[in-house]
Design a protein with these regions (language model features):
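Ankyrin repeat (ANK) tandem alpha-helical domains that serve as protein-protein interaction scaffolds
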Residues: 1-134
Length: 134
């Protein structure tokens, strides 16, 4: 994975949490993969297609968060062990979250933010009051 400056990882976390201004800044300032990751989290097909071509490790991270074991294996086999841990942690693996918080807090916080987004999406999908209104 490309080595990102700490402030860019922090910005990515903010974008994941819904800061559209920062997401758009990432897109325009040589970090389109991080901005498109945010779109792909919300099932944007064109963003997922772009990630598949240009940053498959980020798409595999999203798929791993969604519980796809083959995506986690792909990350581990291809040298993206940290992203595999992020995906597992964001998919409710407490042991991986604990490891991240002890060993790479920046990516631990990133995993927490991804988990919150995915939990919100799942809650909305399960809310019978919202069915048919989106």
């Amino acid at each position: 994975m490309k080595k990102y400056p700490e402030k860019i990882v922090v910005a990515w976390g903010e974008a994941i949490s819904g800061n559209l201004e920062i997401r758009d800044w990432l897109m325009k300032n040589n970090y389109p993969e991080l901005g498109l990751f945010c779109h792909a989290l919300y099932f944007d097909k064109s963003a997922s297609d772009w990630l598949m071509k240009h940053a498959p490790h980020l798409l595999a991270t999203i798929k791993g968060v969604e519980g796809k074991k083959d995506a986690i294996r792909w990350l581990e086999i291809n040298g993206f062990k940290l992203l595999a841990k992020v995906a597992k942690a964001a998919d409710n693996d407490k042991e991986q979250m604990h490891w991240l918080m002890l060993n790479d807090k920046l990516f631990g916080v990133l995993a927490q933010r991804i988990k919150l987004v995915k939990d919100d999406i799942e809650e909305a999908n399960n809310d019978v009051h919202r069915w048919g209104y989106e």
